[in-house]
């Protein structure tokens, strides 16, 4: 069996609040690029934050949890 990682859609509307007004993706990028980083105190644009690590590390964590569920073999499942 081949496992493929889940890749989020490229479109930004998925990450928006469903109840809030829909904004243009270019507007979201412009707003996030001009926001200040509160820790630095300078007016420089902040770096975009990664979503809890790379897709590879998230995939490895999910795969480890999946394998842990089936540890013990066929008899441990109680089937």
From Swiss-Prot:
Region ranges (Disordered): 19-48
Family according to the record: Belongs to the FAM236 family.
Protein name, as recorded: Protein FAM236D
Organism field: Homo sapiens (Human)
Lineage: Eukaryota, Metazoa, Chordata, Craniata, Vertebrata
């Amino acid at each position: 069996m081949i496992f493929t990682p889940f890749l989020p859609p490229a479109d930004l509307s998925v990450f928006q609040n469903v109840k809030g007004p829909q904004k243009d993706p270019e507007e979201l990028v412009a707003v996030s690029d001009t926001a200040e980083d509160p820790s630095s105190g300078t007016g420089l644009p902040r770096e975009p934050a990664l979503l809890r690590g790379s897709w590879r590390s998230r995939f490895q964590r999910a795969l480890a949890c999946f394998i842990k569920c089936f540890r013990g073999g066929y008899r441990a499942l109680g089937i």
